[in-house]
């Protein structure tokens, strides 16, 4: 335990940067699959689009439960060594993540059923190792700092790293692949190798640069389990609301990313626009991320979150109505992606607060269970986001590498704009009406937890009617 006041302890710039580099590396390995794996399946492996959707659905549901298992593993740890409670998983799981991320782009010449089975197994393996690495990375924040402003800073650095990783994937992957005109499938593989190796070294940088200061083990009387991780969502109202909102926002964001490569190629007839659009829109996200700490300090997390959702919805509506040219598409996309910067950053800043809420309410601090309960909702969202584009591409009549019909073009416009817009509006209504954990209540919770530890009082807060009345009124 640090001798500094946990609520005022400041982190070094070097440590914040190292933490941000972690999600940079994580996204380099994740986003090559999010952005291009469906297109690789359809165009190089010859799979029907709905096959890809089913693969994503099955594998993401599987990894939703591996996230839960990771939480159980983290909370079950008792003999914690010098590397800490979470950091060893970042170090050791990152190598198989990079290896499988690359292997997913290996073009086989088997029959379609064998190709499908092979792709499904690889995607599930990627999800398993990614759960071990990324859940540990995210659950580590409460162990790094208890200062809410520093948590917002870490969330901003994390989202900044993720944005730069996504930007590089958007701008750099297809140009590398396009260099191999005689063997497009080899181009996919080489690009995947480059991004995965960079991601691996970034995760190792993160491991070496961050410090766990507040390592607490779960009491022996509390036996972690998948059921308890799942129940942690429903026993923690702020976490439940955040999970529902995140279910909408992550699905919206991933649908947009999955469809944009089809939209630029077939609606705007300019596949090279994808790199420019990625450069400008991800640049807007990066600017938004840099503004998050100041905006949160002035307006509070909830208000900034809602403002980001409104910008997102407005940008998508404008794009659906007037985004028929490349220039307007980029402009309106920048508005929408600028809004997503605040939303995606604060998703991560709000989760550690719910960890403290859970400790205040139950007397048990279980970062792993809370965080993986949250990531369970994210994986369900990602499963739907991976499933829907593949199914919808089939429903609207998409056929690879030919001119698309007017019905198909309209379907692409609806998929990339109206679906994300609708989901953003649902998320805004959910957070606006049901999320109650503001800055004042959070400060009260932290103070009461500290007082309990000082006095050795282990009374569970749910039995303290006076405390509950103070927070809820």
UniProtKB/Swiss-Prot annotation:
GO terms for biological process: carbohydrate transport; sodium ion transport; transmembrane transport. It comes from the Bacteria. SUPFAM superfamilies: MFS general substrate transporter (SSF103473). One of its GO terms (cellular component) is plasma membrane. The chain crosses the membrane at residues 18-38, 45-65, 88-108, 110-130, 160-180, 187-207, 239-259, 276-296, 317-337, 380-400, 415-435. NCBIfam families: gph (TIGR00792). This is Putative sulfoquinovose importer. It comes from Salmonella typhimurium (strain LT2 / SGSC1412 / ATCC 700720).
């Amino acid at each position: 335990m640090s001798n500094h006041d946990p609520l005022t302890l400041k982190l070094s710039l070097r440590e914040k940067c190292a933490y941000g580099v972690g999600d940079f590396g994580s996204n380099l390995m994740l986003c090559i699959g999010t952005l291009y794996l469906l297109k690789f399946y359809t165009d190089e492996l010859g799979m029907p689009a709905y096959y890809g959707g089913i693969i994503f659905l099955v594998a993401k549901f599987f990894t939703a439960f591996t996230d839960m298992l990771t939480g159980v593993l983290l909370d079950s740890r008792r003999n914690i060594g010098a590397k800490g409670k979470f950091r060893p998983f970042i170090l050791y799981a990152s190598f198989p993540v990079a290896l499988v991320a690359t292997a997913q782009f290996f073009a086989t010449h088997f029959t379609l059923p064998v190709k499908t089975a092979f792709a499904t197994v690889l995607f599930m393996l990627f999800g398993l190792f990614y759960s071990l690495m990324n859940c540990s990375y995210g659950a580590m924040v409460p162990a790094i700092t208890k200062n809410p402003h520093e948590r917002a800073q870490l969330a901003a650095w994390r989202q900044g790293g993720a944005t730069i990783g996504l930007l590089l994937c958007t701008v750099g992957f297809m140009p590398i692949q396009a260099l191999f005109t005689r063997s497009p499938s080899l181009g996919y593989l080489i690009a995947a190798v480059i991004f995965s190796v960079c991601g691996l070294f970034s995760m190792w940088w993160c491991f070496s640069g961050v410090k766990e200061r507040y390592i607490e083990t779960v009491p022996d009387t509390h036996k972690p389990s998948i059921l308890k991780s799942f129940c942690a969502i429903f026993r923690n109202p702020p976490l439940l609301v955040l999970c529902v909102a995140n279910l909408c926002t992550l699905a919206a964001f991933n649908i947009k990313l999955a469809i944009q490569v089809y939209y630029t190629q077939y609606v705007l007839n300019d596949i090279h626009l994808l790199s420019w659009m990625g450069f400008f829109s991800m640049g807007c996200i990066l600017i938004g991320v840099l503004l998050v700490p100041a905006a949160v300090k002035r307006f509070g997390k909830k208000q900034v979150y809602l403002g980001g959702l409104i910008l997102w919805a407005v940008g998508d509506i404008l794009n659906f109505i007037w985004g028929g040219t490349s220039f307007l598409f980029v402009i309106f996309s920048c508005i929408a992606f600028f809004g997503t910067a605040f939303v995606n950053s604060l998703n991560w800043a709000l989760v550690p607060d719910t960890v403290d809420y859970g400790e205040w309410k139950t007397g048990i601090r279980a970062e792993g269970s809370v965080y993986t309960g949250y990531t369970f909702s994210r994986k369900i969202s990602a499963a739907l986001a991976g499933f829907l584009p593949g199914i919808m591409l089939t429903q609207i009549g998409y056929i690879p590498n030919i001119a698309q019909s007017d019905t198909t073009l309209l379907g692409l416009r609806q998929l990339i704009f109206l679906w994300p817009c609708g989901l953003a509006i649902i998320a805004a209504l959910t957070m606006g009406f049901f999320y109650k954990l503001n800055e004042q209540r959070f400060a009260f919770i932290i103070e009461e937890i500290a007082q309990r530890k000082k006095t050795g009082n282990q009374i569970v807060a749910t039995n303290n009617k006076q405390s509950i009345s103070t927070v809820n009124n």
